[in-house]
Amino acid sequence: AYHDWMRKNRTWKDGTYFSSGWGCGMDNIPRMDTTRYSAEFHHGFISFVDVTMQQIFNAKNLLAIADLAGIARDKSLEDEIAALEKIANEKMWDEATGLYHDLDREGNRVSVRHIGGFWALLARVAPPERARRLASSLADGATFASPCGTRSLAKGEDGYERDGGNYWRGGVWCITDWAIVRGLAGCGLYEDAHKLAMRHVCAVAKVYADTGTVWESYDPEKVTHGKLYGQSVRRDFVGFSGVTPIAMLVRDVFGMEFTPGKVVWRVRLLERHGIENLTLPDGNVVSLICEKRSSLSEKPVIKVLSDKPFKVEVK
C-alpha cells in the first residue's frame, strides 16, 4: 500500500520519485537551489536519486516476498523496476564523476555529489563495473571517505561544513553507512564492505569510549560526534545509530552472516573474536570464536559450541 501511495503521489511524469529533505530523511542536504527552495520542505522540482533507488529496492523486495508466499507477482512492479533502472543507468549515472545524481526538471543531472547515489548498491541497480567505481569513491578521502565513515556530502561541495558536518552537510550517519556496507556486500564487494565497516565501527567505538554514548551523527573530518548549527547532535541515540556497534560489527567486521540452520563466516580479522551465547531464531544457543592469527594466510582456528547441530561455512 505504501509503495502504491508513493507511486501515485510522489512521482514525476517519467516515473522517477521526488520528496523533500524531511521526507527523504536527509533533512538539510543542499541538493537543490536553496536560495529559491527550502531543502527541508520542498522538492525543488528534481528527481531524487535516493528515493528513486529506494523504490526500486522496495519493489524488488515486494516481488521476493510474493515469491516466498507463493502468490502471483505484480507485473506493474516488474515494469516499474525495468523503467527506473533504465533511467538510473542512462540519465542519473555520470561517467565523469562515477556517481549517480539527482535530475532536474529538464532531465539533466544535478551536479551536487551526495550520499544518496550510493543507494544504487543496495538496490542492485549498478552494474559490476559501476559498483566498483562507487566503491572507489567511498574510499576516496578527497570526496566521501572520512575518519568516521562516509560523508553525506562530498568534501569540496558548496555547503559542505567540515566542523561537525551540520547534519547532512557532510556529517557521517550510521544508517547510511549501514545501507552502503550492505549494498557493497550484496554486490559481492566483501573486502570493500569490510574495510568501510572497520573504519566506521572503530570510529563509533572510539567516540563511545571518549564520551560514553552513541551519537545521532558523526564529524566528517575527525573522530568525534557531529554538530547541527554549531551545537552537538543528540546523544544516547541508539534508535538507529545502534545498528553500527551491533549489526555492522557482527555481519561486516566479524563477517558472520546467519541464515536458518547455517552461519557463513568470512574471516578477515587477525585478533581473537567472535560471539558467545547468541540465541538464534530457532532457539539454538551458539558460541563461535575464532582464535588469534599471525597473518591472513594462516588458516583460522574456530571453536563452536551449540545446543543442537547447525552448519558453519568458513570463507
Where are these regions (language model features)?
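Well-ordered alpha-helical scaffold segments within catalytic/enzyme domains
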Residues: M53-A72, W119-R130, W178-Y190, M248-E257
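Internal metal/ion-chelating core segments
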Residues: R31-A69, D74-N89
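Short alpha-helical "patches" and their helix-cap loops
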Residues: E129-T143, H194-V201, M256-H273
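Beta-rich accessory regions
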Residues: A72-D79, A83-A88, E95, A185-K195, ...
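Extended glycan-interaction surfaces of carbohydrate-active proteins
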Residues: T11-S47, K86-V172, A205-Q231, M248-F254, ...
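Alpha-helical scaffold segments in carbohydrate-active enzymes
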Residues: A1-W12, Q54, N61-A64, D79-D94, ...
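Catalytic cores of secreted or luminal carbohydrate-active enzymes
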Residues: V233-G274
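Aromatic-rich carbohydrate-recognition surfaces in CAZymes
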Residues: A1-C24, F48-T52, I56, G171-A193, ...
